[in-house]
Amino acid sequence: MTRSLKTTLILLASSVISMSALAEFKQAPLPYATNALQPAIDQQTMEIHYGKHHKAYVDNLNAQIKTYPELDKTDLIQLQKQISKYNTAVRNNGGGHFNHTFFWESLAATNKTGQPSPALVKQITQDFGSLDAFKQKFNEAASGRFGSGWAWLIVTPNGKLAVTSTPNQDNPLMDLSETKGTPLLGLDVWEHAYYLKYQNRRADYIKAFWSVVNWNKVNERYNEAIKK
């Protein structure tokens, strides 16, 4: 074997090893059983939404690592904050992976939802007038999002709370988001999130959502956000 051929084979092997060693984004297990959110969200919807839709976002995002090797060293939150550097596939699937991971953690069985903390209620009252007024504004954002997208409660850079919505799989962490902030609560209003149970009745899905909001997690996120 000539030295040049041997060198080529070594470099090729090194490249293969390097590619196979790239870290992949992982889909975390659901923090509850797929039937835990019934009757608000039915088991079949959860199985398809988590097991097929969310999984597809993770798989498709990992497929982009070959195009952008630096992704294997980028965590999911950091990816959102620099999403404009990447192509549409990374934006859609990276956003989809983050949004769904965030969404699952935003939900809990009705006996484990908790309540908004006094500190959060105080800020909600200051920025929206009351908890009910906040929910109404959030409902309007969710129902008013044309087509597919998300509704969000965020902490803005100036420390105030705001309700916003994003199209497709965008989110407020993205550097190209029209309204930026740290998300505390998000609602998926893509049809795949509710159509099996609610068909075209998005308003009924939004109403049911409030019975499974994980306020314990929202409180935790708020406490972290105001420290920054």
Swiss-Prot record:
Positions bound to Mn(2+): 49, 100, 188, 192
Any one Gene Ontology molecular-function term assigned to this protein's record: metal ion binding
Co-factor binding comment: Binds 1 Mn(2+) ion per subunit.
Any matching Pfam family: Sod_Fe_N
PROSITE patterns for the chain: SOD_MN
EC number: 1.15.1.1
UniProt key word Manganese: yes
Record protein name field: Superoxide dismutase [Mn]
